[in-house]
Amino acid sequence: MSTADLMLRWAIALLLAAAGVAAEDSCGKNEFQCRDGKCIVSKWVCDGSRECPDGSDESPETCMSVTCRSGEFSCGGRVSRCIPDSWRCDGRTDCENGSDELDCSPKTCSLDEFRCQDGKCISRQFVCDQDWDCLDGSDEAHCAATTCGPAHFRCNSSSCIPSLWACDGDRDCDDGSDEWPQNCGAEDTAAEVVSSPCSSLEFHCGSSECIHRSWVCDGAADCKDKSDEENCAVTTCRPDEFQCADGSCIHGSRQCDREHDCKDMSDELGCINVTQCDGPNKFKCHSGECISLDKVCNSARDCRDWSDEPIKECKTNECLDNNGGCSHICKDLKIGYECLCPSGFRLVDGHQCEDIDECQEPDTCSQLCVNLEGSFKCECRAGFHMDPHTRVCKAVGSIGFLLFTNRHEVRKMTLDRSEYTSLIPNLKNVVALDTEVANNRIYWSDLSQRKIYSAVMDQGTSLSYDAIISGDLHAPDGLAVDWIHGNIYWTDSVPGTVSVADTKGVRRRTLFREKGSRPRAIVVDPVHGFMYWTDWGTPAKIKKGGLNGVDIYSLVTEDIQWPNGITLDLPSGRLYWVDSKLHSISSIDVNGGGRKTILEDEKQLAHPFSLAIYEDKVYWTDVLNEAIFSANRLTGSDVNLVAKNLMSPEDIVLFHNVTQPRGVNWCEATVLPNGGCQYMCLPAPQISAHSPKFTCACPDGMLLAKDMRSCLPEVDTVPTTQGTSTIGPVVTTSAAVSLKRKEDPSATRHKEDPSATRHNEDPSATSTSRQPGDTPELSTVESVTVSSQVQGDMAGRGDEVQRHGVGFLSIFLPIALVALLVFGAILLWRNWRLRNINSINFDNPVYQKTTEDEIHICRSQDGYTYPSRQMVSLEDDVA
């Protein structure tokens, strides 16, 4: 390539770069330009959340010019934010200047409200509903005994449950009275226990087999004598199913799909897309007419083109010859024939039938789906039993209850609404929440105090709690507990970090940090070693990574705007999250496939904040509605109001032993305590059968030694600042202490999305020569830090340099481009002149070109995710 060509290419590249810079200087019609040049949607300006990285969309100068819409209240003052009118005089200060709580008239209850003894108002429909909606319980005082309907069973505690749930081996009443022997027939039950070889959770068939009790009356005969399907109630279909005229059920999506899925073809009756020629007694002529089927092959012309009287087809039964080529059913028609398939099969090529795998549809079963030839079977995981009436997998054991925050307290509500109490009162600004079921312990974060607390539940009046994380916290919006390994994980949206600590708060470490990210809610899967969190930064996304901070990448990057709460349904292996701007609840499997929108509703999902999954229900909190709702987690149907007037409900979790299954703590299963790690032992993601069970980690500012277990101080570090973090500098080590990284083969999965780049800040990425045990255990406060003042000065200088740099480029860049073009023209002229000079060249036969040999530079095909030196082997510990 000549010098002139090279210079021309440089000139073109600079011109394109200049055009790109100019394009970024302006935003669209419905966009707002941040001070740093970024464009956001105009309706996000002054909405209470910072979408601009520099916060200019929420600055006082910007918000002073905002005009509130109808149904909103203007705070006025220095920051004129808009809040819903419903927040006005609600007893909670929402405006920075407190104007929403000024000049409020004394609280009076309306005619449709009940006044509690403490002065608060609740809806009259909550009175005597067996639920304490007043904190003092006055709404449940002097109530008459509850009367249950004829199809319900009355518990000893006066609550009502469906009669089908009584004596089914599963405690549905909170006091277990639905399973008491005196209510189930003590003599008969005792006799059955003695003579029956089946357990209490099994059904004894008349043909002597034992089957699961939940299989009784499920529509499929499992006993040889079919005794499990005798004396059953009339079959009813699920809300997402269509009931055929013969009583059978098909998935609702198969109704009116132009295919007969019901045996009686009732699923295609009454459909809008049915034409006048559709149906078994209609025939459509080739010329367009529609005639009745009895006029076909009657030796009379009823179609203009005689297509109703073909000579060869009339009175010919094609099914007599090799069944017409049909694999199952051949139906002879007056003209031609058609192949049919039995229930549970579908026609694939006009002749062959194949089994329909109903289990490919995620909504087919509540939990487990077993595909059978021509049918399927729904089953439940351990700890659940299927309800024969609703086909829902119900948890075994005590009744579950919801725990949720409402800024100043943590409340507890049982799912049957028999108990509704204030669990932890008198809090400042509680947001994030999670539990440790086995130890009956609860954890929460307080944004005002900037601390993470822990307490034992149900302490009664003598409530006490501890601050386990009390330093280097800014906005701990998300919290999750690893109940197997005894760790807690939290997000901090200010520095954009995800951190981990033991449940005592003694050891902690930052696992993830990304400039511009805004991690919000987090959920963990300690059984498989993964964590997931929502990020409402730019771009918004959902991230996935190992619990030890490795293999982090973006799982969801499309059709997502403001992801808030996230939860994991372990039995189904699906993630659920709410999007506050899309007003939706969505789900996806843990590998990023099978995405589905469960529900979209601007009223009931006005501003969803958090959600929880239990059995077949999804529960979510809504800040604007000040309420908790529930719906079917598979279909989004059956939306119900669980609680209201909650004063900013935020995080919500479901407390039940089935939500936290037991697992192996490999850090404690080895001979060496703490897995042989000097500081922290963190579970590793189980990507394959060869993945390590755990890896060691060091506090921020320290590195793993060569033994990959002990910790050493970082050397030759260069502190840098990132964002507005004051937790500590992001440090880079010199080549002398760097560890060679292998290429991650899975990184190609996210080439289209820059945010999908995997991050690994595990200190195991570096090592130095040091003997284990030389360095004592260190806390995070001993790591290298940079003061807030120094970081602010550095950030200010950076902004100033950037402003001067932009002005300098605007002057220098055009001059440089013109100079390059002139220089390129001179080179082209000289090149043209040299070509016009005649010359004679003599090739030297001795000189041979030696640069034609190809040089191949190979790199390892192994992934970097788990270097061999990081793996901790149990056999090594035993040795």
Curated annotation (Swiss-Prot):
Where is there biased composition of kind Polar residues?
718-736, 763-772
Please provide an example of a Pfam family that matches this protein in its UniProt record.
FXa_inhibition
Transmembrane feature ranges: 808-829
Sites bearing Phosphothreonine, chain numbering:
717, 724, 732-733
Annotated InterPro entries? 6-blade_b-propeller_TolB-like, EGF-like_Ca-bd_dom, EGF-like_dom, EGF-type_Asp/Asn_hydroxyl_site, EGF_Ca-bd_CS, Growth_fac_rcpt_cys_sf, LDL_receptor-like_sf, LDLR-related
Which residues are recorded as modified (Phosphoserine)?
A: 734
Q: Which PANTHER family match?
A: LOW-DENSITY LIPOPROTEIN RECEPTOR-RELATED (PTHR22722:SF15), LOW-DENSITY LIPOPROTEIN RECEPTOR-RELATED PROTEIN 2-RELATED (PTHR22722)
Does this UniProt record's set of keywords contain Lipid biosynthesis? no
Repeat positions for LDL-receptor class B:
398-439, 440-485, 486-528, 529-572, 573-615, 616-658
Similarity remark? Belongs to the LDLR family.
Function per UniProt: Binds low density lipoprotein /LDL, the major cholesterol-carrying lipoprotein of plasma, and transports it into cells by endocytosis. In order to be internalized, the receptor-ligand complexes must first cluster into clathrin-coated pits. Forms a ternary complex with PGRMC1 and TMEM97 receptors which increases LDLR-mediated LDL internalization.
Which cysteine pairs are joined by S-S bonds? 27-39, 34-52, 46-63, 68-82, 75-95, 89-104, 109-121, 116-134, 128-143, 148-160, 155-173, 167-184, 198-210, 205-223, 217-232, 237-249, 244-262, 256-271, 277-290, 285-303, 297-314, 319-330, 326-339, 341-353, 359-369, 365-378, 380-393, 667-681, 677-696, 698-711
Coiled-coil stretches are none
- Topology versus the membrane: Single-pass type I membrane protein
Extracellular face: residue ranges?
A: 22-807
Renumbered ranges of motif NPXY motif = 842-847
Where is this protein primarily located? membrane
What is the top-level taxon of the source organism? Eukaryota
Name of the protein in question: Low-density lipoprotein receptor
EGF-like domain mapped to chain residues: 315-354, 355-394, 663-712
Instruction: Tell me how this protein assembles.
Output: Interacts (via NPXY motif) with DAB2 (via PID domain); the interaction is impaired by tyrosine phosphorylation of the NPXY motif. Interacts (via NPXY motif) with LDLRAP1 (via PID domain). Interacts with ARRB1. Interacts with SNX17. Interacts with the full-length immature form of PCSK9 (via C-terminus). Interacts with PGRMC1 and TMEM97; the interaction increases LDL internalization.
Q: Where in the cell is it found?
A: Cell membrane; Membrane, Clathrin-coated pit; Golgi apparatus; Early endosome
Report the PROSITE patterns cross-referenced here: ASX_HYDROXYL, EGF_2, EGF_3, EGF_CA, LDLRA_1, LDLRA_2, LDLRB
